[in-house]
């Protein structure tokens, strides 16, 4: 987005970024993020794991609400007033938006809010669409890594302030509820709670060893000890049951379609 050679196109891109609440010079990095995101390198990362909402009448009566979502300014009060419903307690919640991304345009939206349940049971394609409808995108694994830097690499989970890595609780917690689970840039729950989809794909691994003596975080990059024949989209951070395998270096791959739409996988968006 930043490597555009036409001055006219670069200006248009900058204006669009500014309209979405993220600002910066026409051909340079972003310098300000919406209130629901944190600065991370040259872009913005959502502060919280995504809460996916279905907005009724998104192009008519609720066009203003959709615009607030896209600007990163929609509050829980705004969403409730607009009749937006939260999705993600089962795979069926997202229908008619399908696991391969059909019928998702102008249907589901990803918001970054504190103290709500993050949405799970979502495929990579659905997460991609929810971000796109919200004028955002899935982050790359490299972008995710920058935003996660400084997050605690868990030991035991005390069940209150530590990252939600279990394995004793075994359920996701409300976004931002674990006050000690915050990165150097101010993003919450990047370790534990839900695994998070990122944009990158790799052949899915057959096992997930650690990083040797460097870290005990889960390491499932293709070729670690073997890979399967089906493609996988990368997930980061570990989940609510991962224990010491969770951490800012935790990486695995999962089927991007309905097979990967599990109760332990969510996502967050970037700009």
Each model region followed by its residue ranges:
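Boundary at the C-terminal end of the N-terminal hydrophobic targeting segment
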Residues: 20-22
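Short aromatic-cysteine micro-motif
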Residues: 32-157, 162-188
